[in-house]
């Protein structure tokens, strides 16, 4: 109900439930977003309250390099989001535009960080670093980070440190943060 209430497409929700990418925790009924390694072992989990409270975070022991994702192989590009909900919203929008969301490489960064004072010294997020190491076909990185201060700073940092090797596109949400 929570994800559907957020406007996420029913087919996408069902896919995530069937693949155990999203589960419901008990007794609080939080939505839990799971990331897996290559052996289909869960390595990352983020939770989000499904009620009006803003309780959310990473589960203890989570490894961000395996963050929540919906991946397609050999697409040549990756779409990056601050969180799982943003990723699922984008997949829904693509479906509404008639595009096959299953053919897109969608990855949550599991949050963004403040770049270094000297922006060139900023580091690539572990999630993205691992993905770029594993998938040598990626040439284009599309950033769908929020329009808030943290999202804009992280976008600027990633554009600065990655643009010598990749085409880096800034495509923030048109509405909302």
Where does each model-flagged region fall?
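Basic, glycine-enriched DNA-binding surface that flanks or lies within the catalytic cores of DNA
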Residues: 1-71
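Terminal peptide-recognition signature
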Residues: 3, 33, 82, 90, ...
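Flexible, charged surface loops at secondary-structure boundaries
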Residues: 26, 70-75, 133-137
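Short active-site oxyanion
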Residues: 75-79, 140-141
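Conserved mixed alpha/beta catalytic, RNA-binding, or beta-rich assembly cores of soluble enzyme
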Residues: 80-85, 110-114
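Acidic, divalent-metal-coordinating active-site segment for phosphoryl/phosphodiester hydrolysis
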Residues: 85-86, 154
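Short, well-ordered amphipathic alpha-helices
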Residues: 86-95
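TOPRIM fold recognition
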Residues: 94-177
């Amino acid at each position: 109900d929570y994800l559907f209430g957020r406007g996420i497409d029913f087919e996408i929700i069902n896919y995530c439930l069937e693949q155990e990418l999203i589960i419901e925790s008990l007794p609080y009924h939080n939505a839990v977003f799971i990331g897996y390694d290559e052996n289909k072992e869960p390595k990352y989990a983020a939770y989000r309250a499904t009620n009006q409270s803003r309780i959310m975070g990473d589960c203890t022991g989570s490894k961000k390099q395996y963050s929540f994702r919906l991946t397609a192989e050999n697409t040549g590009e990756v779409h990056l989001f601050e969180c799982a909900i943003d990723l699922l919203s984008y997949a829904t929008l693509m479906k509404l535009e008639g595009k096959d969301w299953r053919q897109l490489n969608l990855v949550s960064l599991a949050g963004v960080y403040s770049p270094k004072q000297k922006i060139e010294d900023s580091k690539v997020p572990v999630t993205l670093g691992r993905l770029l190491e594993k998938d040598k076909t990626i040439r284009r990185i599309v950033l769908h980070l929020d329009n808030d201060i943290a999202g804009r700073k992280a976008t600027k940092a990633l554009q600065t440190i990655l643009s010598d090797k990749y085409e880096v596109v800034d495509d923030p949400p048109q509405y909302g943060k």
